[in-house]
């Protein structure tokens, strides 16, 4: 495994990005939309600024979804019809992968053969489509898992559902088929090797980024006024999907032991926690802290900045987190973070410098750590938080992505020296079909 900036190869001109189960245009914090959506969209936008054209394929979820959305110059989102628009759970999507693949191939057929230089699939469902497209188009496949079933199942929250065996099988297939694997952290690379026997030489470490132009420090009093919060209160915020995996209940239970803390929860339901918002409201009532808990719906990026600025601390108590974009966004706004010491969070948060990491999910430990940080005065960590977040720009992420792409293209050409001949034969067949002649 290596940092992606090592040994830069020829960068691509056009990239096909696959995001089957969730659209990059969806509001993070709702449904299955979260950090991956932000990653897919922001990396595409920043690649386009480098002159790389990006087409993102995702599944249409409403009849109103247009077939094509031009997000920005050089960035296109294609909504592929595959299965019913409403009521299809993420765990039912494997039944629609053939339909999705057909839609992707039909879209590619409107271009000249060889139009895409590379395929980048996100999440295992997309990887299943990716290696079929790779074989059809004779281009390399780069895959980012974002999460792994074995890792999630090893750290299940109470009341959460385990990932099905089908996913683990599918992930193994994608790991075996992908030309390169992109991971968020060194830990994730080690997990791919130990759990899926991945070849370390095919793994690139690429840290996700944060929009440093949007997420910036600002007036805390103004942010609180906009949210209707008392400027004198101590506020600890939770941002994300309301599901057992993200563990917002841990924060509420810890807050019950801290009578001077107000909890601000910004997010919507997803995954196996579809009833979680109501359950979270009920939990606050049961704990006797309803008057100290403020619930907000999922926020736009601009509104999310106010949430981060308004908070004295942001809590990320997840049971599993491949990186933790929320933690970096909060720090970019100058707000320290208390986070679970899991997954990529020890990379996203500098323990004792920009916040604190908590081992495990014991409520007493969380209450003690939050109280300790608040007693020390979070202001002492704010400058360090901003400086740390500045190392995670999308510009850096795209530098590393393009380096990984270049290496994938170079390696693929070395392994498949006749790839151009394959494309030539496909071109001949396609033009013959258009002219009604059998090639």
Curated annotation (Swiss-Prot):
Gene3D superfamilies: Glycogen Phosphorylase B (3.40.50.2000). Keywords: Glycosyltransferase, Magnesium, Metal-binding, Transferase. Its EC number is 2.4.1.250. It comes from the Bacteria. UDP-N-acetyl-alpha-D-glucosamine binds at residues 27-28, 35, 241, 246, 299, 321, 329. The keyword Magnesium applies. Mg(2+) binds at residues 308-309, 311, 335. One of its GO terms (molecular function) is magnesium ion binding. It is an enzyme of class 2 (transferase). CDD domains: GT4_sucrose_synthase. The keyword Kinase does not apply. InterPro entries: Glyco_trans_1 (IPR001296), Glyco_trans_4-like_N (IPR028098), Mycothiol_biosynthesis_MshA (IPR017814). Homodimer. Catalyzes the transfer of a N-acetyl-glucosamine moiety to 1D-myo-inositol 3-phosphate to produce 1D-myo-inositol 2-acetamido-2-deoxy-glucopyranoside 3-phosphate in the mycothiol biosynthesis pathway. Belongs to the glycosyltransferase group 1 family. MshA subfamily. This is D-inositol 3-phosphate glycosyltransferase. The lineage of its organism: Bacteria, Bacillati, Actinomycetota, Actinomycetes, Mycobacteriales.
């Amino acid at each position: 495994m290596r940092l992606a900036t090592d040994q830069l190869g020829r960068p691509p001109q056009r990239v096909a990005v696959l995001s089957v189960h969730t659209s990059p245009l969806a509001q993070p914090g709702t449904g299955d939309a979260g950090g991956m959506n932000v990653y897919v969209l922001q990396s595409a936008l920043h690649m386009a600024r480098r002159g790389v054209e990006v087409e993102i394929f995702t599944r249409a979820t409403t009849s109103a979804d247009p077939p094509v959305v031009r997000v920005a110059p050089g960035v296109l989102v294609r909504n592929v019809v595959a299965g019913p628009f409403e009521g299809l759970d993420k765990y039912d999507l494997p039944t629609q992968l053939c339909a999705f693949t057909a839609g992707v191939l039909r879209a590619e057929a409107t271009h000249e053969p060889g139009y895409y230089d590379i395929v980048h699939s996100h999440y295992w469902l997309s990887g299943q489509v990716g290696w079929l497209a790779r074989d059809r188009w004779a281009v390399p496949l780069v895959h980012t898992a974002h999460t792994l079933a074995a890792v999630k199942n090893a750290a299940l929250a109470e009341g959460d559902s385990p990932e099905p065996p089908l996913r683990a099988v599918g992930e193994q297939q994608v790991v075996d088929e992908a030309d390169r694997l992109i991971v968020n952290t060194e830990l994730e690379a080690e997990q791919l090797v130990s759990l899926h026997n991945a070849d370390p030489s095919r793994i690139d470490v690429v840290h996700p980024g944060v929009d440093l132009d949007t997420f910036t420090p600002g007036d805390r009093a103004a942010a609180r006024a906009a949210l209707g919060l008392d400027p004198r209160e101590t506020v600890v915020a939770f941002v994300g999907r309301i599901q057992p995996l993200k563990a917002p209940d841990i924060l509420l239970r810890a807050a019950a032991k801290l009578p001077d803390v107000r909890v601000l929860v910004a997010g919507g339901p997803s995954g196996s926690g579809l009833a979680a918002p109501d359950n979270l409201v009920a939990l606050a009532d049961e704990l006797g802290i309803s008057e100290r808990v403020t619930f907000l719906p999922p926020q736009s990026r601009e509104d999310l900045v106010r949430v981060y600025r308004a908070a004295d601390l942001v809590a990320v108590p997840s049971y599993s987190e491949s990186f933790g974009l929320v933690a970096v966004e909060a720090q970019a706004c100058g707000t320290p973070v208390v986070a679970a010491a899991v997954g990529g969070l020890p990379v996203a948060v500098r323990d004792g410098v920009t916040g604190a990491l908590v081992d495990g999910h014991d409520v007493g430990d969380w209450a003690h750590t939050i109280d300790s940080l608040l007693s020390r005065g979070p202001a002492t960590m704010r400058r360090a938080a901003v400086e740390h977040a500045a190392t995670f720009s999308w510009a850096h992420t795209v530098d590393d992505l393009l380096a990984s792409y270049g290496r994938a293209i170079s390696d693929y050409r070395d392994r498949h020296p006749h790839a151009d001949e394959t494309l030539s034969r496909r071109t001949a067949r396609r033009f013959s079909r258009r002219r009604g002649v059998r090639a």
